[in-house]
């Protein structure tokens, strides 16, 4: 099994194969980002704030190219808060104004109050630039892998190690 590593040319080919897999995944992610006009075209629901519409662990697909249509009340959007790294998935409950100057107020379906406490200090409403995208599709529970990897960091090392071994030890 490990004898295939004895040949330097074969080991280099396996390493290149592994690098090709990683770079292909990266290019697919970047391509999807360009197509959807969203820095994060796929996100995972991390909390129960949107139940019953979305459960923790659901994988959401976003679209941010609404050139002819504005974000409307009732639409589920994903937004970033200034100086915070975690995207938030909530529903638009109020809209003030139109176009690029529109201000949005959001709230989780399972929350008692709106999101004003979650916004950046001094910010009362979201602007269009805060929106990462609108939810257009979802896959239930597929995102639990991401949640497990973030809650148990050692699993990342184990998974990467197994993937690396599979690529290196694979016979052609």
Curated annotation (Swiss-Prot):
GO molecular function, one term: serine-type endopeptidase activity
Residue spans, topological domain Cytoplasmic: 1-14
GO cellular component: signal peptidase complex
Ranges for region C-terminal short (CTS) helix: 158-169
Main location: endoplasmic reticulum
Membrane topology: Single-pass type II membrane protein
Lumenal-side segments: 36-172
EC number, UniProt record: 3.4.21.89
Residues bearing glycans: 111
Catalytic reactions on record: Cleavage of hydrophobic, N-terminal signal or leader sequences from secreted and periplasmic proteins
Catalytic residues as annotated in Swiss-Prot or TrEMBL: 49, 90, 115
SUPFAM superfamilies named among the record's database cross-references: LexA/Signal peptidase
Gene Ontology biological process: protein targeting to ER; signal peptide processing
Keywords linked to the UniProt accession: Endoplasmic reticulum, Glycoprotein, Hydrolase, Membrane, Protease, Signal-anchor, Transmembrane, Transmembrane helix
Subcellular location: Endoplasmic reticulum membrane
Gene3D superfamilies: Umud Fragment, subunit A (2.10.109.10)
Keyword Transferase among record annotations: no
Domain of life: Eukaryota
Free-text comment on this protein's domains from its UniProt entry: The C-terminal short (CTS) helix is essential for catalytic activity. It may be accommodated as a transmembrane helix in the thinned membrane environment of the complex, similarly to the signal peptide in the complex substrates.
Subunit structure: Component of the signal peptidase complex (SPC) composed of a catalytic subunit SEC11 and three accessory subunits SPC1, SPC2 and SPC3. The complex induces a local thinning of the ER membrane which is used to measure the length of the signal peptide (SP) h-region of protein substrates. This ensures the selectivity of the complex towards h-regions shorter than 18-20 amino acids. SPC associates with the translocon complex.
Entries under NCBIfam families matching the protein: sigpep_I_arch (TIGR02228)
Summary of the function given for this chain in its UniProt record: Catalytic component of the signal peptidase complex (SPC) which catalyzes the cleavage of N-terminal signal sequences from nascent proteins as they are translocated into the lumen of the endoplasmic reticulum. Specifically cleaves N-terminal signal peptides that contain a hydrophobic alpha-helix (h-region) shorter than 18-20 amino acids.
Family stated for the protein in its record: Belongs to the peptidase S26B family.
Name recorded for this polypeptide: Signal peptidase complex catalytic subunit SEC11
Organism from which the protein derives: Fusarium vanettenii (strain ATCC MYA-4622 / CBS 123669 / FGSC 9596 / NRRL 45880 / 77-13-4)
């Amino acid at each position: 099994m490990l004898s295939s590593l004895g040949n330097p040319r074969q080991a280099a080919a396996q390493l290149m194969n592994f690098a090709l897999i990683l770079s292909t995944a990266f290019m697919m992610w970047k391509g999807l980002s360009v197509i959807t006009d969203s820095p994060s075209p796929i996100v995972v629901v991390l909390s129960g704030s949107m139940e019953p519409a979305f459960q923790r662990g659901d994988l959401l697909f976003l679209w941010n190219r609404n050139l002819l249509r504005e974000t409307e009340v009732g639409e589920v959007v994903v937004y970033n808060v200034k100086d915070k790294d975690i995207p938030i998935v909530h529903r638009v409950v109020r809209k003030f104004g139109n176009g690029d100057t529109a201000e949005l107020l959001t709230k989780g379906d399972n929350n008692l109050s709106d999101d004003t406490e979650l916004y950046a200090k001094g910010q009362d409403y979201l602007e269009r630039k805060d929106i990462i995208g609108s939810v257009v599709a979802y896959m239930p529970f597929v995102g639990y892998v991401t949640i497990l990897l973030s809650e148990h960091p050692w699993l990342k090392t184990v998974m990467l190690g197994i993937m690396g071994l599979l690529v290196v030890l694979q016979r052609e």
